[in-house]
Amino acid sequence: MKIALKILKWIAGALLGLIIVIGLCWWLIPDEELNPDARKFTDIASVPPAAKNAYFMIWGFVASPELDPHVVGQQIVAAHDRILAAEKDLSRFKVDAFYGEHKLTMPKDSKRFCDAEKENCLLVYHAKRAQMLEQAEEKKLYLARYRKIREYEDFSGAMSQTTFQTPVPAWLPILHMSDLVDGEIADRMKTKSTQQAALEELDAEVSSWRRLLQGDDWLITQMISVATLGRKYRLASEIMDAYPEVVAAHPALMTKITAPLSPAATNVITSMGAEARFTIGTFASMDTNRRFLADSFYEDLPGLPLRAAFAAGAFRPNASTNDGYLIFKEAIDLFAKSPKQVLEGRAALVARQEKLSRLTLGAVFYNPVGRITNATHPSDFTQYAFRIDDIIGFSRLLELKRRIIEGNIALDKVAAVLANSGAELMDLYTEKPMQWDAATKRISFAIQGKRFPVFGYVTLDHFK
């Protein structure tokens, strides 16, 4: 019995010693050298925002009526950047403190007036005319602020640096004003004498959201711009169906509204680069982010010192930065190619990115926090590039529709028009003419972003 106990004690001691040795080895393994290319990529200096940056108005949009929203936005950005410059925690930074006592708030259950994915918004806006006009009157000050945004030329992001704690502007009220403006456009289109004013408003809307799409390098803002531009384009398509005569009556305006977006007019490579620097930068600040990651992944460990100490072995910032750089670099390199080439290279890119973020035994032992965090990135970054390509394709469909109406093209001639359209109006993903279905009177292409199916077609409903 005593011999058995001695053996058990010996085994237990040996196991404990082995665990201690493994733990020390794990804790003492040095971090790898930082890839010079990753360092160069993340060290790109930010450009201070111009004084007339639209983002100041966007940040201050919901401020109390007595406050200047542009000034409020400047105060928010300056306070945010001061905190970051001092390397302080942003968790206590509250933008609400700048908005005053009577800031604009939206009900949490607020819904859009129209579901552009399922409804004809022109008809919905007509049906909800009284409700929308009433809200427009109630919020006329904020509608004026919304229209003021269109006067800006600089739409680049105002923050000098962003982190995982940087707040997002209050977009919901801005999008609500966008809907109210669309309702006013729809209402004015019903009367011939106000149609020009309606189209001028729509042109201003399209131009403003195009500039935001091109100027900003924040991926979330680009996706908001894509969705909103899609609603504007869908409304333009519905207007051409209901009032095809406006194409001939207002040719210059309609040509501006339907002018196709070009890849150069978007910002996907820059925004993906900014997204990469933001994500990789999460690993750059040792004290703040090691503490954050320790809390996130090991919150059950008692006491912050123990969690931070555990993270010292579980998290290696250079290795994490190097892995993150490789994940993003391949995506950015692919996005520099044509949409057709991106589509063809999509599967290979996803496979390589999944391999880089795979939780192998060696990776988990060496850098579990970094590898787990990198594994949380989307494995398919192409979905964001394709959403932008989809809106470009949608703008091409809209321009084709305008030309068909302008040329009074018969239904049996549409296929020939599509076949003879130039490269600037082709399907981006096949580099061939758009598809035509005479039975449904629909011109289309196969979208790849998957988020907005209605971007993939226009219907020639002006044919009665």
Spans of features found by a protein language model:
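Short acidic linear motifs
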Residues: 2-464
